[in-house]
Amino acid sequence: MNTKETIDAILAETGKAVLGKDDVLRRILTAILAGGHILIDDIPGVGKTTMAVAFTRTLGLDYKRMQFTPDVLPSDITGFSMYDKDSGNFRYVAGSAMTNFFLADEINRASPKTQSALLEVMQEGRLSVDGKTYAVPQPFIVMATQNPFGSSGTQELPESQTDRFMIRITVGYPSRENEIEILKGSRRSAALSLSAVITPDDLLSLRKAAADVHVEDSLFAYMVDIAAATRESHDISLGISPRGTMALSAMTRAHALMEGRNYATPDDVLAVAPYTLSHRITLSGDARFAGKTAASVLDAILKSVPMPELV
């Protein structure tokens, strides 16, 4: 199979377990190919765990899930050193993050210290325990979920932490027809029975192919112009950082690869910008008072910034 056929096969296989959410699956896979992590804002019970299991099966990855609660400790994520009386030495006991695909469920119920431990692993690709450093397996993907802010026992993730996630999306309720189909059979069981389409090494190769997608200088300038517009907007108190433009660039390349191209276009930028950038901006007090949202302000900016004409 060529690259496009492989990507289509991955989506088709995961779609067997996740009904009616093709757009969500495409966004998640795009972020995975871009080398990023995924943050999902939604209520419990809409299929987030099923999606995670479906992708790990289809991509041939090891998988661990942790339910975040206030009593979860950083060592539960990173691991710890334990004295081995037989050898007389300390040995490392791996934590939940020592895996390919880590589902951090309800991350905004954990303490800030525990959240920071996970985000450090996400950023560095390694973890430190008692002065020793351990690399996490590659590829390493974190899918974190959080309940809507204001739910019992939740605390809002600060901007510095949400900025570490490549994309922030919602799943939403299924349609009436799809919910009926869900009732007819167990989607979780369907996810567990999925076949691996690729191996972890194949995924690393796909990531390299995404990174090699050609981007014209004028398209880079377009991304920077979008970021600059967020920094200058009166509706925004905190605009897109350079990390945000780097994420936009990576997602643009990955989206082009998803479409079967080895070059990026302005349409790729516009396709990924809403869910790559909206969680990276902070609205001003006046904008919030006026009922504006990050998505609506960003949409207006995307419509106002001139698109480049590629040669």
Model-derived regions: residue spans:
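Dynamic helix-loop-helix/coil hinge segments at AAA+ ATPase domain boundaries and subdomain interfaces
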Residues: 1-24, 212-214
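Conserved alpha-helical scaffold flanking the Walker A/P-loop in AAA+ ATPase domains
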Residues: 27-30, 83-103
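Phosphate-binding P-loop
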Residues: 29-35, 43-44, 94-97, 134-136
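Walker A/P-loop
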Residues: 32-69
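Walker B catalytic acidic pair
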Residues: 42, 105-106, 117
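P-loop (Walker A) phosphate-binding loop of NTP-binding proteins
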Residues: 43, 77, 145
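Canonical AAA+ ATPase core
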Residues: 84-89, 110, 114, 122-213, ...
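C-terminal engagement/docking regions of AAA+ P-loop ATPases
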Residues: 232-311
